């Protein structure tokens, strides 16, 4: 969704009759806010498998994938990717297909 923001400002500081106005507008994409994908701890998947999925789906190194997996295991969740809403929807779908619990939310 695009929203047009229009700002009207007089060219001269004082408003007089026959004043010309300069129109400034810039499109603002309100859906361009950053989104994150969150993987949640579950009682089913082994830690080695979760690490493997992070490496294969996101191309993370083994140490980084292991760090994220341990965060999921110890804290109950971890942010594994961030970007546009559409790309996070794709990531969540891939994680679900791999059997992991994942959600997305707008980053604050």
From Swiss-Prot:
Matching InterPro entries: ClpS, ClpS_core, Ribosomal_bL12_C/ClpS-like
Pfam annotation, one family: ClpS
Source superkingdom: Bacteria
Annotated GO biological process: protein catabolic process; proteolysis
Physiological role: Involved in the modulation of the specificity of the ClpAP-mediated ATP-dependent protein degradation.
Subunit structure as annotated in this protein's UniProt entry: Binds to the N-terminal domain of the chaperone ClpA.
NCBIfam families found in the cross-reference section: PRK00033.1-1
Family assignment from sequence similarity: Belongs to the ClpS family.
Protein name: ATP-dependent Clp protease adapter protein ClpS
Organism: Mycobacterium leprae (strain TN)
Biological classification of the source: Bacteria, Bacillati, Actinomycetota, Actinomycetes, Mycobacteriales
């Amino acid at each position: 969704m695009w929203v047009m923001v229009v700002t009207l400002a007089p060219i001269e500081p004082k408003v007089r009759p026959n004043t010309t106005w300069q129109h400034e507008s810039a499109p603002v994409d309100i859906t361009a806010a950053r989104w994150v994908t969150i993987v949640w701890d579950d009682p089913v998947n082994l830690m080695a498998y979760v690490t493997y999925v992070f490496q294969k789906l996101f191309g993370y190194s083994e140490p980084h994938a292991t760090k994220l997996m341990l965060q999921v295991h110890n804290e109950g969740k971890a942010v594994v990717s961030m970007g546009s809403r559409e790309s996070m929807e794709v990531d969540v779908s891939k994680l679900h297909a791999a059997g992991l619990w994942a959600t997305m939310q707008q980053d604050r």
